[in-house]
Amino acid sequence: MISMSVPRKKQEREISLLMHYVDDVFPHQFPIYHSQFVGKREWLLPLLSSTRSVYYATLCLSLLHKEKSSNLDQPGSVSFCQEERLRYYILALRETQQLLQQLSPVCDLEAMRSCVPSLASALHLISYESSCPVYGDWKVHLQAATSLIPILVGGWNSMIKPIKHTSTLWTGLTLSDFHDLHTEGSLSYEDASALRFLTNALAVTGILSFISTGPTSALSDYRYLMDATCDMVQCDQFLGCENWVMSAILDVGLLDRWKREEEGNRRLSFRELANRAKRLEDCLENGIRELSAKTSGSSDAVSSITRIYASSTLTYLHSVVSGLNPDLSEIQESVSRTIELLKELSNWHLLACLTWPLCVTGCMAAPDHEAFFHSLAISAEISPHSLRHTWIVLRILKDVGKVRGSLGEQILPTWEQILCIDGAPILLT
């Protein structure tokens, strides 16, 4: 726990901001994460007050949420809030950089203990930088978080016993599954719970970011994370989308990277491209059929979200293979399927978890579907005052419509060119 000597009034205000994060910001950021999962939120407050880096990053994010959600109609109030937010941000940035610089590359207990607040701070700064009106360089913080993947994977697999049971780690892990948790020579239960959650947050953020940044070399890091963590990553309990679809999104990104590299070397084989794409398409189609058969007539949130992500991933796949051409029959088919699934949603608030598929589908949809996406925004009460990025989809769709009009019959540019506002890439989380 951090120890700081600050005036009482300031201390009270900072504690109030911490509780605002716990009560309002955290549920808003992660609406699918429920208290029945292992660890509940018992790890959250200890984490937020564990180091100066996490503490300050939480305060600046909490202030940003207050600023966006409150009616600060007095210029003085707005100015004070912004100044405080910027001050905490600078402190968080400095402390996080120091923490990362001190982190040992050796995967031992001390590195794991330091890795938890380092990752938490980086993820907070990503949320802060990627939100309106900040729109800063969230990519540098994601790069820092991605560099922690080897420590996360190595530490998790070495410090948690191999567990064989029918349920997932998040729903089946108990204290007896840890090595000597009562001693100082082991990872605490709170740290282990935070580690699970933060690793899932990193996996989801990283995988969904590549459509905005382009298929970088970091794709391989996330493939390693998904394959090597022995069920630690459970995206359905974090985002509502099952792992197999998140892996498919990752594989489409890897296909995009391979295609661009082959094109750059003037050796792209269209037959090989078609074969690779067909394997991904078959995997997605089979997964959708199996899920639909298991959940026929069900309004379960995870199955609904997973099918929407899977269907929109097909659109993403077709756009990578054939270009961003909304007139292609295969793109029209997957777009229509996704729109039908969106219409079947029984809970409009689930749209908060669907920024990525909404954007992919909306950008490739026919112009006559524009009214449908606006009606979704109204139904879900999507607002620019939110820390989530669902509302920005509407602006992107409007910009894409303008680009289409100017290009005529030409296809749209790359995804990373589309998903950019005022020179900053938009994170679709």
Curated annotation (Swiss-Prot):
Disruption phenotype: Reduces markedly the expression of hepA and abolishes the production of heptelidic acid. GO terms for molecular function: DNA-binding transcription factor activity; transcription cis-regulatory region binding. One of its GO terms (cellular component) is nucleus. InterPro entries: Fun_TF. It is found in: Nucleus. Keywords: Nucleus, Transcription, Transcription regulation. Coiled coil: none annotated. It comes from the Eukaryota. Disulfide bonds: none annotated. Its main location: nucleus. GO terms for biological process: positive regulation of transcription by RNA polymerase II. Belongs to the TRI10 transcription regulator family. Transcription factor; part of the gene cluster that mediates the biosynthesis of heptelidic acid (HA), a sesquiterpene lactone that acts as an inhibitor of glyceraldehyde-3-phosphatedehydrogenase (GAPDH) and a growth inhibitor of the salt-tolerant lactic acid bacteria in soy sauce brewing. Both hepR and hepS regulate the transcription of the heptelidic acid cluster, but they are not involved in mutual transcriptional regulation and act with different mechanisms. This is Transcription factor hepS. The gene is hepS.
